[in-house]
Amino acid sequence: MQVFQITKQQDAISVSPLPVPSLYRKGDVPAEYYRDQASGASPRADLNLKPARFVRTIRLKDGGFTGLAGGTGALLTVVITGALTLRNGAGPATTFVPGDLFLSQAEELGDITVTAQEDCGLLQIGVAADWPGAEATLQSPGTPSPRTGAPNIKRVYKGDDDLAYFREFPEVFPTPENSWSEPRSIRGFRFMCWEDGFIDWHPEVINCFGMFLSGQMEIESSGDHKVEIFRTGDICLAEDRTGVGHIDRCHGATHVLLLVSEDEAIW
């Protein structure tokens, strides 16, 4: 994971490392922590979510693109697939790849030349003007986990038997190429880094959209015991809020961007 701040200068763009707030966890986590919240035996945990105005996605045709902003305010853009190159005037170009994120002001993106390569897919969050805030720190890049081939994009849901199952998640990119999806409301978002850990069978408790930015996560479903492996640029929407749930196995320092949605606003 690499996080940057992009600012426009007269004939160039300035690219600087950006500190972000993130929860760090290492080792195993008791499954009862989640089971008790899902059953109501203990109160829901405070997720310390950061507010977001919206989230949206886009797939880009290879070549130039002029609608990277399409709004106002502070925007956090995440590269899911392919590559995205930014250039201002005669200044040097900067290319972002899966696992890269950049914060920018929408008003500064209009004159920047944007070029997409290799079936580029993006997710963009409208963040608060004061994000990332005083608690932000520079993050380590995490354990490299380059993906080969298409991204693994799944959702895990609870079946009628109270067991969890995977299915494909095409709703992430619902629109034609070069067209942003409709802005979607979310409760908020946060970053987490989990290093080398395990959680036994547990429900997710919340609707949690996870974008993996480093490391490797194995998630095993309780319904058919299928194991899906998520690496940099992969996505899993966990919506098995109750029931038996799933197992998590984390390998390496795994950075994840987590988006939390209400039931009525889920994909």
Predicted regions span which residues?
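A short hydrophobic beta-strand segment most commonly corresponding to one strand
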Residues: 103-104, 117-134, 237-238, 251-267
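A short beta-strand-loop-beta hairpin characteristic of the jelly-roll/cupin
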Residues: 70, 76-97, 203, 209-232
